[in-house]
């Protein structure tokens, strides 16, 4: 069987959606997560579901149920391109190795300073502006290789007040 992620990505080429993840879950569930500039609508999920159902049938991909959805507000970030795309946003990262006895940091992501031609030769160094202690803002510099997992971490205001 071909690489399921690559097959799915190829099937979605030209559909104006970005493949975020493909996951096999219990009881034959195949979960596909997509994203799109401006947000994913139900029509996008329906269109992707129809397309993938046909492709998976032709490619003999074994599944009982296909679920297509958006990554939600706490979208995972797995590539340098995704980190660059969400520069300026609040994210949470978990480091592979602890720094000052701590692995999890939340703050505002800044784009790498070494963007450009040199970025191909060396991994991009991103910055995360976080509050170490009350009113003590620090910047953590990291590469994608330092990160075990990263995700968007928006501050949601359910009271309806503007900040």
UniProtKB/Swiss-Prot annotation:
Entry's Gene Ontology cellular component terms: cytosol
Highest rank taxon of the organism: Bacteria
Localisation per UniProt entry: Cytoplasm
Gene3D superfamilies for the chain: Ribosome maturation factor RimP, C-terminal domain, RimP-like superfamily, N-terminal
GO biological process: ribosomal small subunit assembly; translation
Database matches in CDD domains: YlxS_C (cd01734)
Keywords carried by this UniProt record: Cytoplasm, Ribosome biogenesis
InterPro entries according to UniProt: Ribosome_maturation_RimP, RimP_C, RimP_C_sf, RimP_N, RimP_N_sf
Pfam family, one: DUF150_C
HAMAP family xrefs: RimP (MF_01077)
Family: Belongs to the RimP family.
Protein's job: Required for maturation of 30S ribosomal subunits.
The protein, known as: Ribosome maturation factor RimP
Organism: Bordetella petrii (strain ATCC BAA-461 / DSM 12804 / CCUG 43448)
Protein encoded by which gene: rimP
